[in-house]
């Protein structure tokens, strides 16, 4: 039984529509090279809540909360060819999307 080579692409952004859009673009590009694709798999959303005082001097009980959510997607490419890897290197992603590639 041959060992299958995998590439895992993890996309992360604060805007879920941006992550979904670029996940679809990556999948469309990889499908042109006839590689097997698994995904996009939605990973759990991480949320951070920041609590700050509304007033700089008094009223400790008056506070405001802000929340930041980071959305993640996972794409697996099974048995990629050299053409697939070249295509992934040439993709230009927007500045709002963080990409992590592992083999």
Curated annotation (Swiss-Prot):
- One example of a Gene Ontology biological process annotation: translation
Q: Which GO terms describe its molecular function?
A: structural constituent of ribosome; tRNA binding
Which residues are connected by disulfide bridges in this protein? Answer: none
Q: Where are the transmembrane segments?
A: none
Q: Which GO terms describe its cellular component?
A: ribonucleoprotein complex; ribosome
Superkingdom to which the source organism belongs: Bacteria
Keywords recorded for this protein, A-Z: Ribonucleoprotein, Ribosomal protein
Q: Which InterPro entries match?
A: Ribosomal_uS10, Ribosomal_uS10_CS, Ribosomal_uS10_dom, Ribosomal_uS10_dom_sf
Pfam families from the xrefs? Ribosomal_S10
The family annotation for this protein states: Belongs to the universal ribosomal protein uS10 family.
Q: What does this protein do?
A: Involved in the binding of tRNA to the ribosomes.
Q: Assembly and interactions?
A: Part of the 30S ribosomal subunit.
Task: Fetch the PANTHER family from UniProt.
Answer: 30S RIBOSOMAL PROTEIN S10 FAMILY MEMBER
Q: What is this protein called?
A: Small ribosomal subunit protein uS10
Q: Which organism is it from?
A: Chloroherpeton thalassium (strain ATCC 35110 / GB-78)
Gene that encodes it = rpsJ
